[in-house]
Amino acid sequence: GGGSGGVRAARMAAQRGARVALAETLGTDGLGGTCVNVGCIPKKLYSYAAHYAEAAEESHGYGWEGPAPVLNWPTLKANRAKEISRLNGVYSNLLRGSGVTVLNGFAHLQAEHQISLSTLHADGTPGHQTFSARHILIATGGTPHVPHFVGREHVITSNEIFDLPDFPQRLVVVGGGYIACEFASIFNGLDAHVTQLYRGEQVLR
């Protein structure tokens, strides 16, 4: 895994003289895991964008005049992607500078000290490589899970919401945890009509 934990562990081990390889599927997401690609960092960028709308509204009381600003969703998405790509490169350079070999592929535990790496060749055909090590650290992180129910095809998770083709004018957020509250707040600030559903009496419990 090439998230925050895997990258840090790989660098620390390499700096102490170990020969280290890190396996990560580098497709739509790069190094850095959830936090960098679909978590903390992009959420902060979108949160900042939402704050500007409120600041613009308050500015009239301080003498600022002119038409209200309009959100350009494609620009926000493009600038977010640009910043995430920059951070992916920072992680890559840190690993390279520490002497870590990055393996692009999906790793499967094959034996106690062995993994099988599933890769795709340039022509699209699948490939497999085997690697052995005295120590194998599992730092795979997690992904959102959507249960099976009628209408499931209309559901997105916190992973997909950053890159929707069109800005959602109406949004229903299910849940009362910090991720749900953050996105409800962000998209409300970006001027979407947001409804938040929660089965309990108090959010953020």
What are these regions (language model features)?
Residues 1-22, 173, 179-189:
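N-terminal Rossmann-like FAD-binding beta1-loop-alpha1 element of flavoenzymes
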Residues 12-167, 200-204:
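Glycine-rich flavin
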Residues 154, 165-199, 203:
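Rossmann-like NAD(P)H-binding beta-loop-alpha module
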